[in-house]
């Protein structure tokens, strides 16, 4: 294994000497969202504020082009999906009209032909932040994410506390010192039909909801990898949603990034190989939680994973490394590979570069 990773490091270095995967993003980019339509990549929100950009990946002179600004204000943790030529943006965390941080449950649609946005008369039955979105048979599916009432209440309390550090410490201790099930992360699967702009119940996880999971789908199968089980506590769980036939089946696969797990990781598929890379977490938090410490990440430093794992023969194998740990960027399918755009590294620093992870014969190639 060490020889393999050493060889990969040499490959990474050789790629670094060549042209970068994509031009640097116009601003350091993290906690945003993105989608790809044919060969055009779209990214926006997060550290980009209300800005959106597109890039034609097959153009001779690749460059990011600014699009119409998002009308719903700056958002973190929104998700997006392309359906029938339009870009849909779901929820996120931002400021309301009173300047208070909140979780949104709204939907916006962007029309690339007119470079224009419209807010739809449609609201999900629950807040959407930390959720994942994927497309299947012309519908968008949403699952996971924080509980809107609990999350909004936390920020209302912080707003009232203002600069009173004693009150803030008390609020944080109260917020984080609960068991995972007491946060009521969303375990329902919702479907959104663009033709009717209606939300429907599509099922629910037999286990628990997560926030900040990585998601990837191919054909009738979708995978949800890791994420938070509660604020500050990750899970190493991997869930598979199988739409084959008339009944949706939920399967639980072998864990990855054990024992602590990560959130904000990246998932993709290359030559039928399922890839999971990066993510951020708190080493030791799982042990703390199992020992009865609900505020499991208290005093721990967030770490950023460089690991690249492949799903092979019913288990995960560490098969390579990123040049640096990163999380909370955008992962997209491109050129039969996993494309990672932006993200944050140690200390929460937003980055502007992109990474391409490809797999052939169970060997990983990383291009920066």
Curated annotation (Swiss-Prot):
Quickly give the catalysed reaction.
N-acetyl-alpha-neuraminate = N-acetyl-beta-neuraminate
Xref: InterPro entries:
Kelch-typ_b-propeller (IPR015915), NANM (IPR056734), NanM_proteobact (IPR019936)
Which residues act catalytically here?
A: 228 (proton acceptor)
Q: Which residues form a coiled coil?
A: none
Outline the Kelch repeats, range by range: 40-84, 86-137, 139-173, 174-219, 222-265, 287-336, 338-367
How far does the signal peptide extend, from start to end residue? 1-19
Assembly and oligomerization: Homodimer.
Query: What Enzyme Commission number(s) apply to this enzyme?
Result: 5.1.3.24
Entry GO CC: periplasmic space
Instruction: Report the subcellular localization.
Output: Periplasm
Q: Which organism is it from?
A: Escherichia coli O157:H7
Protein's UniProt name: N-acetylneuraminate epimerase
- Note the PANTHER family from the entry: KELCH-LIKE PROTEIN 32, LD33804P
UniProt entry tagged with the keyword Nuclease: no
Q: What is the lineage of its organism?
A: Bacteria, Pseudomonadati, Pseudomonadota, Gammaproteobacteria, Enterobacterales
What is an example of a GO molecular function annotated in this UniProt entry? racemase and epimerase activity, acting on carbohydrates and derivatives
Q: Which UniProt keywords apply?
A: Carbohydrate metabolism, Isomerase, Kelch repeat, Periplasm, Repeat, Signal
Family membership, please give it.
Belongs to the NanM family.
Annotated transmembrane regions = none
Q: What job does the chain carry out? A: Converts alpha-N-acetylneuranimic acid (Neu5Ac) to the beta-anomer, accelerating the equilibrium between the alpha- and beta-anomers. Probably facilitates sialidase-negative bacteria to compete successfully for limited amounts of extracellular Neu5Ac, which is likely taken up in the beta-anomer. In addition, the rapid removal of sialic acid from solution might be advantageous to the bacterium to damp down host responses.
